[in-house]
Structures are given as C-alpha cells and as structure tokens.
Amino acid sequence: MINGRYQKEDVVNNNNNLNLNLIEKTLNDLTIKNNTNINNNNTNNKNTNYYNNNNFNNNNNNNNNNNNNNNNINNNNNNNKYLNNSHNNNNNNNNNNNNNNNNNNNNNNNEINNNNNNVLSHSSLSGKGGSTTYETTSYTTSITSSRDTGTISTSYESSSSSSSSSSSSLYDDDEYSDYSDSSDSIDSYVNHRQALSKSQQQQHLQQQQDQPQPLHSSMGAISNEKPPSPTNQQQQQQHHHPKHNIELPKTSSFGLQPNSSIPHKKSRSDFDFIRTIGKGAYGKVKLVIEKETQLIFASKILNKKLIIKEKKAKYVNTEKTILDSLDNPNIVKLFYTFQDENNLYFILEYCPNGDLLGALKKAGCFSIDVVRFYAAEILIALEYLHGKGIAHRDLKPENILLGKNQHLKLSDFGSAKQLSIGSHHKGSRSGSFCGTAEYVCPELLTEKSAGVEADIWSYGCLLYQLVSGKLPFKGFNEYQTFLLITKREFSYPDNFDKCCMNLIDQLLDLDPYKRPTISEIKNHEFFSSIQDWSSIPSQTPPPIEQMVPQSPFPSPNSSLRLKKRSLSVGSPINSSLTYLSQPPIKPLNLDNSNIDYNDFENNQIISNNNNNNNNTTTTTTTTTTSANTSGSTNNTLYFTSPNVTSPPTSMSSNNTPRYINPLPTQSTTTTTTKPAYSSTPSSTILKSTPPPPILSSCSSNNLLGKSSNQQYQPFQFHQQQQQQQQQQQRERSSTTTPSPTFLSNHHNQHQKNLQQSFSSIDKSSFSTSSPMSSPRILLKPTELVLMDKDRKRNIREQQQIDQYQWSRFLLPNDEIILACGITEKRSGLITKKRQLIITDTPRIFYVDPVKMTQKGEITVDGSLSAQQKSSKHFIINSKGRSRHFYDLDGQSKLWVDLINELNMLSFK
C-alpha cells in the first residue's frame, strides 16, 4: 500500500492467501448484529435524494470478476438522506474464478458498528410539536481512477449535521413555523421522489456507462490493508460541505396542501390582506383570506423592530408556543405562523362579532342570564389553561372575542406565563409585571409576584363589569387605581345581584390563597343552574339585550376614588364639607329632547353677593344668607363672579357665559333638589360653606393661562325674582319628582339669566395679555418640611381656591402644589404648551391647558434630575428619558433648583 492506495501489483501471485486474509480481517473488524441490512447498490443515481423510512440499501449483487480477479466496486455518489438505523449489506457470490476461491459473505439482517470509520451510517431523530432536533452522520464510498497510473483509490467521506429548530429564538428564520414530523408527509415525499420513469432510470444508467472505467491489470488485486480513515481536518471540511447539510422539511402542522403531497410552508404571498380590524401597541390585526382555500382568518402582524426595541421578543415567542399547544373551543386557534423581513405573522381563527368590550358598550351591561353563560365559558377556558399550568395574566373584555355563534374565545396570550402544572395555591409564581391596571391583582403590586390566582382576581373584576357595566377599581390615574386595588376599595350599585355579589366578594380577596379554585367557583350558588358544564360550548348563548348600566358611585368615605369635579357638586374646601356623591344621570325618556343636561349640570350652584339687577330667573338651588348675628335671615339669591387669575377673552357665539365660579364669603345653607332619577331623597339639606366649582371645560381663548388681578363685578337679582324663586323652592320641596316640563323650563330660563347677567359685565375687565408669569414657585420643599399639619391644611384649602383649575388633577385632600406654570414642551420638531405642575407627593406632571387633560407624568425616583441648558431651556431626566421644557419668561433656573431640591429631600 502506497499513499493510501491499493496497488494491483502487490497481490498478483498470492491471491489465495490475500483473499483469505481479507476475509479474516473483515470479520475481525466488523461487529455483526441482527436486524440491519446494508446493501451496496450498483445503480448510480447521482442526482436523487431519497427519504426512506426503513432501509438505506447499497447492493453489490453477483459481481463476477472472471478476467482480472478484481472486485468491480460501484458506488452511490448520492446525498442520501435516511432516517432510521437499519442498513443492509449483502455481499453475494463474489467469485474469483481464476484462483478457484469462492468467498460468500451473506451478512443478512446485520447491524454494523462503525468503530473504525468503516462504511457506516447513523442517524437519530427526535421531535415533538414545534421543536425538532436531529443529527446525521454518514460515510459514503467514492471511487477515483487514474488512467495514467492505473490505480484505484478508495476514500471515505463523512458528514455530520446537527440542527435544532425551536420557537425560543426570535432571530431564527423558521421560528414562526409549526414543524410537523408526520410520517405520512415523509412517505408521500418518498413516493413522489421514487416515481421516476423508466426512461429517467435508463438515462442515469446510460450516464454511468458513459463515464470512464478504471483500468484493470492482471497483476492487480485488492490489498488486505484497511482503507485509511479520514483525518480530523478532512472530517471538519466534509462536515461543512453543502451536500451533507441534511435538513428535514419544516412546515406548519396546518401547512399540508390538500392537493399536493409535498409539504408547503406558508408565507405572506399565500394570503390576501383585506382590511385592518384591530390595532395594538406592537402591531395590528387584519382580515385575510387564504388564496388556495378561500378561508377567512385574522392575521396578527407584529413589527420586528419595535418588538426588539421594546424587548418583547420573549413574550412573542411565549404566545406562539402557548397557542400552539392549546386546543379548546373557548380559546382562539392558531393555524400558521411565518415572518418576512419586517413583520411577524400569526394566522388566527377569525371571530366576526368583535370583542366582549364592544358588546358590553352597546348593551350597557348584561342580564344575569347572559353574565352567567359567558362567565361559565370564561371559567371553562381558565380551567383548561390552569390545568396546563398556564396563567393568562391579562384577562379583560378586550381579550375575549365573540365567535360566529356568539361563543366566547379567549385570545391574546402575550402576557401568559407557563407555570408548573397544578400550581394553584402552592405552585410557582411569576415576578414579572404585566396586565392592565384596572384588572391587576394586589399581590403583584405588593409582593411583586403572582400565579394563577391573578386570573381569579381578574375574573372577579370582569364579572363585576359584566353585571354593572363599570369597573370596580377606577381611579383618576394608574397610581390612584393601584391604591384602590391594594385597599380593596369598591362598592356595589343598589340593584346588584346578591348571589353574584357574594361570589365577587370571594374572588376579590386580598389574600390570593383564600380565593376560590376553579372547581369551587363552579360549585358556587351563582352557577347552580348549570348542570352539565361539558355542554356549555354546544349550547346557544342567550341574546344580549340593551340595558341601563348599574353605575357604582363612590362611597362617601373614599379619599382615593375619582370624583367628578363639576359645578353641580363643587369641590371641597375643607374636610367638613359634605357633597353629593351621585352625579345626575340623564333620564332615558323625556318629552323635551332639546335639554342640554351637561349645561344644566354645570350651572346650577348659585352663591351670594349683593348687587341689583332687573332680571328674572328660576333655579334649582336657593341660598339662605345669614344677615346678622341675631339669627334673623333674609332670603336672597345672588350670582357672583369667579375669583380667577385671569378672565376669558371671548365668549360663545350666543354670548352665553360658560364659566361661573362663585366665591363664598359667608356661611350659607344650601338646599339641593336632586332629579327624579336619583336614588337619594329629593330634598337634601347640606349645611356648609358652598365650594367654588371647578371649570369643566375650556376653549382655546379662555381664562386659563391668562394673567389679571381684576375680578368680575358681582350682581344680584330683584326682590321680585327672589320671591319667585322662593315660591318655586317651596313647590319643589313638596314634590319628590320634578317633571320633565319643569326641568325644561328651568334650563331655558337659567340660560336666559346667564346671558343677561354676563352681558352686564364690564368688557374692559377682559385681558388679552400674555400667559401668566412662569414658573410660579408657590412653595419650596424645605419650607414645607418645617410646617405643621394645620399649616399644611390651610395651604391646601387656599390652593383649592387660588389654583382651583388645576386641583382636579391632584389626589383628593392629599397634595400641595409646589410649582405651577405654563411652559412649552418640545418633542422632536413639535412644540406644545403645557402647564407644568410639581406637588409635594412628590409628583411632576403636565397638562394641556386648552383641553384640560393630563398629558403625561414624570416618574419621581432616584433617577430624577434637572439640567438648565439656557435661560429658557431646561431638561428633566427620569428613567433614562429626557423631556425638554422651555420657560417663556426665562426662569428655567427656578424649575431646575426646585426639582433638584425636591429630589434631594425625597431620595437622598
């Protein structure tokens, strides 16, 4: 043997001995086992790749070398892809006639261990669901010939490929495909590839015959030396050779085409995108039609760049994995997943009737029968999820869809978490914060962890909302909502179902381990009418009828619940003030449809001051003013002008004043008559100082943000008007239900009074000057620290008068404004005016002074800092984000010093 080649000249005269040695050596090197056949096939199909479930056959049959005493070796130079560990090797009737040595090696059904890198093949395949892992190592024999040297060289090639496809990586191209290892699809592929025509086979044989044959010499024979094993470098090169990279077909489990035996992976081109039917934070949902089947689906499209930027890849993969493992009639189905350069696509079951929130808004609230049925369907879906150890963690009406038969489908598993199976009450818990503020469980706010018990809490909130049409926990902002949740502060409407109320009380337990399990909820009295839970998905849902929502009103002792700040209820000046807890509700059926109850609600508080005016009016509120200390009273009714920082610069087209802010100067007794549709007694006597009402709305040219020290001149009505009003008050006191006609007359007359009274105001008092001096540093944090409680309370009460237009954005009875001023906030190329407010809580937020809505809040923590860039420009940094503000008066240094001082006292 020279340079790894077998020389024919070495074995001319010793054929018998060499063949015997070869047989003995071969038997020693090969470990023979049962149930495997390796056959060397003389057919040289160079361009055919077979997927064979059972055998990889290479047959050497009846190779008779009569003239040159050599074995004519034929090789399969194919990239054969095979799946099982069964190989056949038949060396039949290899006759060497010249030397009369017949060596028959019939190794049928033998498995050969490749300990010496012989002609072996090993493959392993494992896979389940959407994850497939496979390894393949193969060695093939190749023949090279040289006409010049007359030598035959046998070499061995090895290939090894390992691949793993899983849904855990966002950057894998096939990550959003559901993989199927179905043997049926593989058999179909094999049958398709093996269905070659005879002419094609003959063409392959003809090509084989046309190839140059190796030279044979009478002196040549095969050496008994073992063929050389490939070196490590050769193995490494062969391992990365393209023809050895074996890949199984990857396709969705739903991706098999009905008219094709080859699995097809779906892509965007397979669907027609019709229209957008929903939008979310990271993408949108479109109605799509599959071109081949004309089936309708909903495609959830997620933007890749946005997901990576927001670090939400983990949640997207979790949603895909969880949806792929679920199969329940009350859970939306996932059919295909794929991606392109920019987006990820979830092809989901289409629910044509929208979500539960839309149905709830149309109906107002649901009847008990509808609530019971849909609550049962939601419970079935939760039971299925919790049985698999999955917590949804974002249960709300927006994530519950209505199918074509009005049955519920739970969707949106982006916040879902895979926990241990049977984790209720003692299993694993997740510490990540997710969900919606109004439905979040208290343990996630306090303990920073939650399990499947979080779904039970959200289920209780959802049940409350379906019955009443309102949320149980709803504050002015998320912070206030969280306080309501942690204190479990909510109330029920008057006509709330008692049985359902008992169930909700158990569901909304602050202790997560005291909340009932799914089975305990099923056995509750509220679901006693359901005998067969398994028949719920096949039942016809009860019809949804429009109803009047049972609005829950804030409890009187609530200091955190959002209270509507309007002229009808006023704003508290001190802790002794008692105010109406129930804002008026519009009646359903009134004779006069032209009544504007918004204006009626916002313009019915009348205060007192003395001035004569010849006007007539009728009102629903009278004020009795103490005239002297002897206790005698003089019944008069007055309007007073608001004590505002600046007056409005324009009025509406009909000269109707929109803002009247009475300034209380004396102790009064106010009698308020509630409308007929209120549940409280018709006559409620409130003995207190009337509060200054809060502006309910404003226009672009209103009194907000204007500076003026002038006040409106007070005016009063004639004595005859006062007597008429007193007579009307006595009439209203004697009846409990004012008629619609009375309400209409009151509204119309009241509007006339406002027009006449406002026309008497001196127009010179209106100012069109520039916005108020900014910033208005009202109080420094260091000064506030040294104050006692009484002093703080007095400041708070005074601010509710001086800064009343901004007090609606404060936490009730808790916050003191440290600074308040008009600024310009710049975001990119856009600059908008914003009222910047800093409080002692501490809180920093900014308000749109025109729309009177809070536009944003800056987190106050240890990362807070402020920088002065110029006399007007300053930056507030928090949580890695910078917000640019511009002080119009060039006093940016005051803002910076105040913010840094506040941060130092709070967190240093």
UniProtKB/Swiss-Prot annotation:
Its EC number is 2.7.11.1. Residues 302-346 are annotated as: PIF-pocket. GO terms for biological process: chemotaxis to cAMP; intracellular signal transduction; positive regulation of phosphatidylinositol 3-kinase/protein kinase B signal transduction; sorocarp development. Residues 53-170, 179-189, 200-216, 607-684, 710-741 have a biased composition (Low complexity). SUPFAM superfamilies: PH domain-like (SSF50729), Protein kinase-like (PK-like) (SSF56112). SMART domains: S_TKc (SM00220). Residues 271-527 form the Protein kinase domain. Coiled coil: none annotated. Residues 250-262, 696-709 have a biased composition (Polar residues). It is an enzyme of class 2 (transferase). The active site is at D394 (proton acceptor). Residues 764-902 form the PH domain. It catalyses: L-seryl-[protein] + ATP = O-phospho-L-seryl-[protein] + ADP + H(+); L-threonyl-[protein] + ATP = O-phospho-L-threonyl-[protein] + ADP + H(+). CDD domains: PH_PDK1 (cd01262), STKc_PDK1 (cd05581). The keyword ATP-binding applies. ATP binds at A281, Y282, G283, K300, E349, Y350, C351, D355, E398, D412. The keyword RNA-binding does not apply. Residues 53-267, 538-560, 606-755 are annotated as: Disordered. One of its GO terms (molecular function) is protein kinase activity. GO terms for cellular component: cytosol. Keywords: ATP-binding, Kinase, Nucleotide-binding, Serine/threonine-protein kinase, Transferase. The PIF-pocket is a small lobe in the catalytic domain required by the enzyme for the binding to the hydrophobic motif of its substrates. It is an allosteric regulatory site that can accommodate small compounds acting as allosteric inhibitors. Belongs to the protein kinase superfamily. AGC Ser/Thr protein kinase family. PDPK1 subfamily. This is 3-phosphoinositide-dependent protein kinase B. The gene is pdkB.
